C-alpha cells in the first residue's frame, strides 16, 4: 500500500524518499487502513500463549528535529522545522484537516506555530496507539513503548503525545549526550515523565 505512507511538506513520500536513512518509512496514522492493520498485526503476536506482552517502537512521525548531536551526521542544521522532515501532508491528512478547520495545511504560512495542525498530528498518532492498546489489552496482555524523552520534547520532535496514551509502561530514551546535556538533565526528564504519567503506568528510565 504505497498510498499509506507519510508525505512531507515538500510532497515527498516516505515510501520512496524516506528522511535521514533508508528504513525511515513511516505509515500515515490518518489513513483509514493503518490503525486496524497494525492492531491486528500486534494482536496476532500478543495472542501467542508464550507471549506476555508487546512493546511498541517508532510509533510516531519522523523526527522533524533530530537530537542536536546527530545534526553533523547528516550535514544539517535544524534550528527550524524544515519541509523535508515535516510530516504528514498526504491527501488524506490535508482533506481531514480542511474538513475540520477549513484550512489546507499546505497553505499555512507558519505550520510549526499552528496549534490546530500540531494537535491534529499528535491526535493521529495517539489514535493508532490507542487502537493497538485496546486490541492487546482485550487479549489481557501487557503493552509498553519506547518513547522520546520528556513528553514535551516528544510532542515537538516526533509528534508523540505519549502522556495521553494508555499503556502499561513507558521507556523514555533519555540519552543526555544526544542533546549535549549534563547528568542533571536526566533527572529533570525523568521527573517530567513520572509527573505526566501520574501513577497510571510505570516509567523505566
Residue ranges and their predicted role:
Residues 1, 56-61, 148-150, 175-177:
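Active-site beta-loop-alpha junctions enriched in small/polar residues
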Residues 1-21, 58-107:
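Aromatic- and acidic-residue-enriched segments that line the glycan-binding/catalytic groove
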Residues 82-205:
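Glycoside hydrolase catalytic-domain groove-lining segments
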Residues 1-49:
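Active-site-adjacent "subsite" loops/lids of carbohydrate-active enzymes
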Residues 49, 58, 121:
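Aromatic/pi-system hotspot detector in well-structured domains
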Residues 38, 45, 54-57, 136, ...:
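Conserved, mostly hydrophobic/aromatic
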Residues 50-51, 167:
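A structural motif
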